Every structure is written in C-alpha cells, then in structure tokens.
C-alpha cells in the first residue's frame, strides 16, 4: 500500500515522520536520506548519520554566520563570533532540535536508550546537523536558511547578544566564588576521533566534587556545556 498525502498537505499522512516534517517545514523526497539522518552510530548499521553530520556542521556554520552578518550589521567580529558560538554548538543545536521534537524520532541503540541517549546534547545536536545536511542535499541552501530562521524565531524570544549569548563558565565562576569561595576546575576525561573530527569529554569539579560531564567538538565547547549543567544544578539557570 502506497503512502498517501492529504489533499491540502505535502506531507505523507501515514509516514512515521509526517509530524516531524510538518514541524520542520520540509518533506523529504527520499525518506531513506531522512532515515539516515536520524540513525545514530550506536545502532551499528552500515548507514548512520556521521557523514551527514560532517556536512551539516559546515552548512549550518555558513547559514548562521551569514544570518548574523546581515542581521547585526552594527556588531564587530568579536560580538558576531560570540553570537555564532552560542548557536553553533551542541547546546545551541539541541535547543533548535527540541523545537521540532527531534529526540522522538532518533534511532539509537538499546544501551543509549537506557542511558537517556535521546536527551544527550552530543547525540541530538549531531542528528540536527545531519538533518539539515539532508535538507541541503535535496533542496539547497536557501531552504536551510528559511528553516533555521524559523527555528531561531521559535526557540528564542529575542535574537540579540544580551539574550542569546551567555558565557556559562564565567557565570559559574562568579557564582561559586560567591557561594563557596572557590572556582570550578575542569578535567579532560576522554579525547577521540581523527584530527578533523575530534570529540572531547570534560568533567567539572567544585570543591573536589564532580558536578557535570559533557562532550563537545572542542574542549571549550565541552567546558561550556559542563558549566551550563552545573548552573542548572545550582538553580542559577532555569
């Protein structure tokens, strides 16, 4: 039985991804490409989303960089870099991914399910990058730009430096100095992957107690994720 489309909708109504595609604002012509974008490497399948993630990282860096360049013409390179860093990160892409409930559609291993893998920023942000790569391959850069603009509008009440960027490490250090008279420390737990696609796992300690662990494409990104988690635990970030 063939998939059916409703008369007034471009989305296949009995497709398992119809709701996702509607939230995204794009219907994939090749559902296998969509499947691949949603498949994490933990599934041990021949096709997973790692290659698409690689492409999506480059596409999103360009799209978001251009968007910020045109929107914030009064900002210098330093401010633009801070804005971009807050969006082009595991935390930033996870925020956009959750707007479309991407976590509900991921294909992950049973062990990742047990460890709450659907909520891990490293997994969710990678899937988001892969998904955008899929859109780019089928529909081009303009469609990705339109989707990202829409998701940013839905994810953030205001898109500016004050509301979008926060240096979580600085905020955490100020808080721990005020509350505990100490500063947090960071330790590298693991480093893996080839030079062009590294992944770092960092741990954050306060008074010799581990408060958070996180992964990122750089030590700085992983440390920011750790700081964000610690701030949440300390009720500083809601």
Swiss-Prot record:
E.C. numbers: 3.1.26.3
DRBM domain ranges (all copies): 167-236
Enzymatic reactions: Endonucleolytic cleavage to 5'-phosphomonoester
Enzyme class: hydrolase
Binding-site residues for Mg(2+), renumbered to this chain: 53, 126, 129
Every RNase III domain range: 17-140
Keywords in alphabetical order: Cytoplasm, Endonuclease, Hydrolase, Magnesium, Metal-binding, mRNA processing, Nuclease, RNA-binding, rRNA processing, rRNA-binding, tRNA processing
BP GO terms, sorted: mRNA processing; regulation of gene expression; rRNA processing; tRNA processing
Family annotation (CDD domains): DSRM_RNAse_III_family, RIBOc
Gene Ontology CC: one annotated term: cytoplasm
Molecular function in Gene Ontology: double-stranded RNA binding; metal ion binding; ribonuclease III activity; rRNA binding
Record InterPro entries: dsRBD_dom (IPR014720), RNase_III (IPR011907), RNase_III_dom (IPR000999), RNase_III_sf (IPR036389)
Location within or outside the cell: Cytoplasm
Cofactor(s) in the UniProt record: Mg(2+)
Family (UniProt): Belongs to the ribonuclease III family.
Subunit structure: Homodimer.
Matching PANTHER family: RIBONUCLEASE 3, RIBONUCLEASE III
Protein purpose: Digests double-stranded RNA. Involved in the processing of primary rRNA transcript to yield the immediate precursors to the large and small rRNAs (23S and 16S). Processes some mRNAs, and tRNAs when they are encoded in the rRNA operon. Processes pre-crRNA and tracrRNA of type II CRISPR loci if present in the organism.
Protein name: Ribonuclease 3
Native species: Helicobacter pylori (strain Shi470)
Organism placement in taxonomy: Bacteria, Pseudomonadati, Campylobacterota, Epsilonproteobacteria, Campylobacterales
């Amino acid at each position: 039985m063939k998939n059916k489309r409703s008369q007034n909708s471009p989305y296949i109504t009995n497709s398992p991804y119809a709701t996702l595609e509607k939230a995204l604002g794009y219907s994939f012509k090749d559902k296998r490409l969509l499947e691949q974008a949603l498949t994490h490497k933990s599934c041990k399948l021949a096709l997973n989303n790692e290659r698409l993630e690689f492409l999506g990282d480059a596409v999103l860096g360009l799209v978001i960089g251009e968007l910020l360049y045109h929107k914030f013409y009064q900002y210098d390179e330093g401010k633009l870099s801070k804005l971009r860093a807050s969006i082009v990160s595991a935390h930033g892409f996870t925020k956009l991914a959750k707007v479309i409930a991407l976590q509900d559609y991921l294909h992950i291993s049973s062990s990742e399910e047990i460890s709450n893998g659907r909520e891990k920023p490293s997994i969710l942000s990678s899937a988001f990058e892969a998904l955008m790569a899929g859109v780019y391959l089928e529909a081009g850069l303009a469609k990705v730009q339109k989707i990202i603009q829409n998701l940013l509008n839905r994810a953030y009440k205001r898109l500016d430096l004050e509301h979008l960027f926060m240096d979580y490490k600085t905020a955490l250090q100020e808080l721990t100095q005020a509350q505990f008279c100490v500063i947090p420390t960071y330790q590298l737990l693991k480093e893996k992957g080839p030079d062009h696609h590294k992944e770092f796992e960092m741990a954050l300690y306060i008074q010799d107690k581990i408060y958070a662990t996180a992964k990122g494409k750089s030590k700085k990104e992983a440390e920011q994720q750790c700081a964000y988690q610690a701030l949440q635990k300390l009720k500083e970030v809601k």
